[in-house]
Amino acid sequence: MAKSALMAMLRRAASIAQKSGETGIPADELLGMLGVKRSYPLGNGTSNSPISRRQLLHGGLAAATAVAAATFNREGAVAQSAGRSPILVVGAGIAGLTAAYRLRQAGVRADVIEANNRVGGRIRTAPKVAGTAISAELGGEFIDTGHTNLISLATQLGLRAIDLVAVQAGFVSDTFFLEGRRFSLEQLIADFAPLASKITADLQAVGDEFSYQDFTEAAERLDNLSIAEYVDQADTSTIVRQLLRIAYTTEYGRDPEEQSALNLLFLIGADANSFQLYGNSDERYQIDGGNNQIVNRLADRLSDSIETGTVLEGISLLPDGRYRVSLRSGQSAFDRTYERVLLTLPFTALRDVKINVPLPQPKLRAIQQLGYGTNSKLITGYRSRLWRDLYRSTASVYTDLGFQNSWEATPFAPTGNGLVTNFTGGKQGLAIGAGTPEDQAQRFLNQFERVFPGVRNLRSGKAVRAYWPGERFSKGSYACYLVGQWTQMYGVEGERVGNLYFAGEHTSLENQGYMEGGCETGQRAAVEILQDLGLIASADAVNARTASNLNNRRPSRKVPGARNLGNRKPSIR
């Protein structure tokens, strides 16, 4: 699913506020020194400061890919001739397809089952939305500069990433419309300064290492505090409190009263001691032609192994260490036996599976209780892009008007008309599922009109709604730690149990909720399986590619000790 671009602004605000305090340079001067494009009230001029392009791929990636290809080809023949038993991959989203693809490159056959009648999971591109020629992302949408595993995979598949910053250069990036008026970035940074200092101090108290097995008293105390409680206790303005409520409701998909305060610290405070213009999450890229091309091209390469419309109903551990899976396809129910099973389906869906496998209590608790967001999307069409033509805006809005967050969908489409995505979470994410899409579109349009007067008269076509909480096989948008869940679960989600492996965005240590998280953990699971099969050179080849990516990665969130945790041996076997 899409993640809130507001987080990048808040990270910038935290960093700028801290540097302003350290250096004595006023925040607005620092903004000017950096060439940051400001969000001006109507009628004011705008900065034309250029924003430099960043490299998508870096040195070493091509070499790693070449080595990997040669190794896969060499070991692949060995693996196939050895007649190894099949592996089952449950779920044909980005995690499952990436894992199966990496295994296939090493010559290891894996069956892939998918409960839906299509591949892609929560990556879904809708064509010709609202009567336009423009496609829109109903699920996973944005790719960060630091999402190097996903960018590398897309490049290998012959796909091109579009730089949204370059496409929207010269426009006001974000409009903050609160209490009936626009607020500038300078105002928000000034108000945010006291809270930025508190976040920095609390992050230091959390310590240098963190997992469900290893955490400090300060981490536990903060984990058992909600974001709402944390912010209410802080010395900051009402506007910043409102902005944080909007930011975290859309970012993680649950209301601030439900979320652990560590969600705030590890995301907004990830780079409080550095001075980076965009923070770690810049949501800078989309795939030309739609993100679903990634999963579709993977599926094309695995077409002889994928069974859609096939539901996992149960899994049992047999006395010989193999697994019996109970499957259903239409009216037919049947069992199969596998030596290794990779589960990539969301824990919300795994809760419906009868698991007759001994699981450690922390793993079982995560499966049963891990929070998930209620993020939903409503996409509306317009005959022209008034927000651009008249207001010089990207249509990226954060507001308390009733909707929470909006942006222009697929802004690089070469057409005169346009689409706007209304992105919601928390109680509003659930409420947007009521009535018809047109009912919801009218509510949104009345509110959107207050930000961009005149836009209501340009509405065209039928609205499209993506209501992820109502999807049978996802029941939500993406993982979200609720109060107390960091110290109960962080790190256990991806740990294997015997030859039962786990992947998916919910198992990612640093990219939870992103397409990158699914891609990264699918690769990680493939490496674990290859190592277990004795295909060490193939596993090393995947690791070499990953290492090349890691040298240039910037995780979406930075948790103390996450890289060490990711490199350790699994504690559950």
PLM feature segments, named:
Residues 1-51:
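N-terminal secretory signal peptides
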Residues 6, 487-573:
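C-terminal lid/capping helical subdomain adjacent to the catalytic/cofactor pocket in oxidative enzymes
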Residues 30-39, 211-314, 329, 337, ...:
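Active-site/ligand-binding neighborhood in enzyme catalytic cores
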Residues 38, 44, 48-77:
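N-terminal export signals
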Residues 81-206:
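N-terminal glycine-rich phosphate/pyrophosphate-binding loop and immediately adjacent elements
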Residues 317-334:
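Conserved beta-strand-loop-beta-strand element in the redox core of flavoprotein oxidoreductases
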Residues 338, 345-475, 545-548:
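C-terminal segments that line or cap access tunnels to active or ligand-binding sites in enzymes
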Residues 455-507:
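A glycine-rich dinucleotide-binding beta-alpha-beta segment and adjacent secondary-structure elements
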